[in-house]
Structures are given as structure tokens and as C-alpha cells.
Amino acid sequence: MIIKFQDMQYELISKIKTTVSGNIDLYLACDVKRREEGLYTVACVRDMEIARKLIMVTTKQNVSLSFRDLHASFNADGKYYVIFNYAQGRTLQQALEDGKFNLRERLQIMKNIFAQIFLLNMPECFLYEALRKENIIVDDSLGVRFNYFFTEIDYYWQVQEKELMNRVNGLVHELFARELEKKSSRELMEFALDLDEGCYGYLWDCYV
């Protein structure tokens, strides 16, 4: 199936999923004219009420230019389409299950997650989505990219900084579960405790 809008054409390769609400279908796709540029996640939004809300966070004029993962958005055939860059590779969840990363590598992954979210400067709702361990892709050099699957679309409009901090807290406890359980690193213990107690008001406070 080909989706066309103006001079853009996207070929839908396979279906990723339908969201729990049933209002959004997600597909893996490629640009028909520029297949070498990689893959995309195409979100097909059938519910126009959701589409109207998404317009505020998925159009180029409403988001930061640095949010490069957002490729395009448009109306076509009575539906609203949002196109994101698709990150291929092993998820953080899979990497943690493998248990192959040493402490230094896991610290670097956490640092790269922070660096990437600040670099992209994405809307809070997508940051909340990106900070899920199954949406974080880790490459062989420990670089980090994100996927966007609208997992909790109904909650997007309620996301505040405290929800983002909770997501980061969860990642820290998973990435460094061994060290926290054994109490083998005082710095990590103090950092995790500060997160638990809500000592950081903003994500930037954790990074600096």
C-alpha cells in the first residue's frame, strides 16, 4: 500500500500494531523515492479528535527544529498521518535481559539517553513515550535512538515533568539494579535515592 501526499510517497511494508484504543494503526514504511534513507514509523490516526490534539505536537511549526525524529505529518484520505524516523536494532529492554553490559557501558548508555533527549528537545508527550525501555534502541557503539509507538496516547495530554522524572527513575533502577541491590556504588545509591525522594525537579537537574 502506498500513501501519497503532495510530492511524498510512503510504502507501507508491514504493520507494527494497533494502539489499545484502536484509533491508531502503526506501520513500518519507506520513502518510495528515497529508499536508501532508511525506514519510518507511519502512524495512521483515524480519530479526528485525537488528530486535532496531535497537530499541536506533530507539525513542524509547533515543535522544535531539533526534533529531527519527526519526519512529516499531513492529512490524506480522511486520516491524519504522522511519520517518524524508525530506529532499527536491539532495544534497551533486550540489552538488559542479555546482561552483557558492564557498569561503565551502562553509565555511558544512561549518559547517551540524557544527551539525546536534550538534543532532540521533543514535546513532553513524546519524551514520555521515548523513555520506555522497549522504545530505546542501543547500537554497538552504545549510541541511543528512540522509537515512537503511541503506547499511551490517552495519557499524552496529562504528562508533566514529574511523570518524566518517574520514567527516568525507572530506567536508573533497571540499568543499575545489580549495583543498587549489592550497594556497591555509593554515588549510584545516592543518585537513586535522590530520584526516589523527588529531589530533582527537572530532567536537566539530573544531567548536570
Stretches found by the model and what they are:
Residues A87-E97:
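Structural motif in protein kinase domains
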Residues A115-L127:
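Protein kinase catalytic-loop region centered on the HRD/HxD motif
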Residues N62-F67, Q88:
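Flexible N-lobe loop architecture of eukaryotic-like protein kinase catalytic domains
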Residues F126-Y128, V138-Y207:
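C-lobe/activation-segment region of protein kinase-like
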Residues L131:
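Hydrophobic HxD+1 residue recognition
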Residues I2-S64:
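ATP-binding glycine-rich loop module of kinase domains
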Residues L96-N112:
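Activation segment of protein kinase catalytic domains, centered on the conserved DFG
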Residues D69-Y80:
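Short beta-strand micro-motifs within the conserved protein kinase catalytic domain, predominantly
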